[in-house]
Amino acid sequence: MPVSEASVSAGRRARLGGLYVIVGGADPVAQARAAIGGGARAIQVRMKDAPAGAVLEATRRILALATGRALVLVNDRADLALLAGADGVHLGDDDLPVPEARRLLGPDLLVGRTTRTLEEARAALAEGADHVGYGPIFASRSKALPVPPRGLAALAEVARALPAPVVAIGGIGLDDVAAVARAGAACAAVIEAVLGAADPEAAAARMQAAFEAGRAARGATP
């Protein structure tokens, strides 16, 4: 069931806009610090092989950095998002179904879902997701792709069709991020474009500024 517009998650959903950085690896807290320092609007904590306790600790530390500055979502683990006091969870193909995550988290936390087609995106929203990740938009800079890149035209179609934020993901770099915003994405999700840079904080600042310029060009209010 779609989430009520009166819920707290609706307020969080309204804040989904701008650079969305996925952190993990050896030092996700340092990565998040740099990304938030550069103006990232959302952080996704993705620590695939880490023990639950390590994910919980890192998420709590990132939340302390992000207060009043960025949303923090946990990858996969709705239980850890709830325990940490995060803003929500992002679910992939092998994670909890959206309705079960919503039942665990209640109406106040964000539930995002990976999608690759407009049909999948509509289904995720119908099941109770607040927003969708959509992609890959371009060839990925960090991993092999299960499907061909979707491109900007498909992103624009999805963004126009959905009554909820679309987080674009897949191969987005500094040269692409303004076009992603102009296509209607609420957020541009990145890893290597920020975390692979010599100065991640400066890279985040450049990408956030470019995203805002693209959003302004399509006539949206920053």
Curated annotation (Swiss-Prot):
Pathway: Cofactor biosynthesis; thiamine diphosphate biosynthesis; thiamine phosphate from 4-amino-2-methyl-5-diphosphomethylpyrimidine and 4-methyl-5-(2-phosphoethyl)-thiazole: step 1/1. It comes from the Bacteria. GO terms for biological process: thiamine biosynthetic process; thiamine diphosphate biosynthetic process. 2-[(2R,5Z)-2-carboxy-4-methylthiazol-5(2H)-ylidene]ethyl phosphate binds at S140, R141, S142, G171. Its cofactor is Mg(2+). Its EC number is 2.5.1.3. Binds 1 Mg(2+) ion per subunit. 4-amino-2-methyl-5-(diphosphooxymethyl)pyrimidine binds at Q44, V45, R46, M47, K48, N75, T114, K143. GO terms for cellular component: cytoplasm. Mg(2+) binds at D76, D95. GO terms for molecular function: magnesium ion binding; thiamine-phosphate diphosphorylase activity. The keyword Zinc does not apply. Pfam families: TMP-TENI. It catalyses: 2-[(2R,5Z)-2-carboxy-4-methylthiazol-5(2H)-ylidene]ethyl phosphate + 4-amino-2-methyl-5-(diphosphooxymethyl)pyrimidine + 2 H(+) = thiamine phosphate + CO2 + diphosphate; 2-(2-carboxy-4-methylthiazol-5-yl)ethyl phosphate + 4-amino-2-methyl-5-(diphosphooxymethyl)pyrimidine + 2 H(+) = thiamine phosphate + CO2 + diphosphate; 4-methyl-5-(2-phosphooxyethyl)-thiazole + 4-amino-2-methyl-5-(diphosphooxymethyl)pyrimidine + H(+) = thiamine phosphate + diphosphate. It is an enzyme of class 2 (transferase). Keywords: Magnesium, Metal-binding, Thiamine biosynthesis, Transferase. Belongs to the thiamine-phosphate synthase family. Condenses 4-methyl-5-(beta-hydroxyethyl)thiazole monophosphate (THZ-P) and 2-methyl-4-amino-5-hydroxymethyl pyrimidine pyrophosphate (HMP-PP) to form thiamine monophosphate (TMP). This is Thiamine-phosphate synthase.
